[in-house]
Amino acid sequence: ALNEAFNRLESVYVADGHHRSAAACRVKKLHAERNKAHSGKESYNFFLAVLFPHTQIRILDYNRILKDLNGLAVEDFLSALEENFYVKKGVAGEQVKPTKAHEFGLYIDGDWYRLNLKLEIASSLQTEDATATLDVAIMQKYILSPILNIHDQRTDNRIDFVGGVRGLSELERRIDGGGYAAAISVYATSIESLLRVADSNQVMPPKSTWFEPKLKSGLITHLLD
């Protein structure tokens, strides 16, 4: 009955654990090549996974904190942002959580700012591929690369990530603590955007999604031999 239920699914998407899935595929391939009696039923053909209906998962924001401003003064950084964004200072004491796509919050020097991508730029992105309209890609293209000289978020130690489950107060705490210069709050990627990227055979940018619910941490051993 379970097999029949899964056979009726048109698609299954890997939402989290891409590297582990790829590693499991490589292990399977190696074992299959060494096993002359390979049947496809051996334990190395399988790995543990949990499936959720897309209607029962949430994608939270995945925010950024920045070590420095690439040598810029705060005023110069804000001026650089104004080339591609409408920049508006927030109300004192109120955090800026983005409420729509192409909107960002910036916490710097004790103040919050709301950044909105300029309309002409947002319109031009509609003709590009599925990843171009993602807010994490917009942040990379118009803030991190040209202004801060951060080109690879996975390897650059000048940027770190804070899951939305920890709230915007965690961003303030990290910046006010003195170890970081600024924080960027990001609008959460929609499920529809994620599926659109996957269906077009593209790859989501790094640290673009924070999924909930998450399974409890633990250790399970899968013996292959």
Where are these regions (language model features)?
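Surface-exposed, charge/polar-rich loops and edge strands
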Residues: 1-225
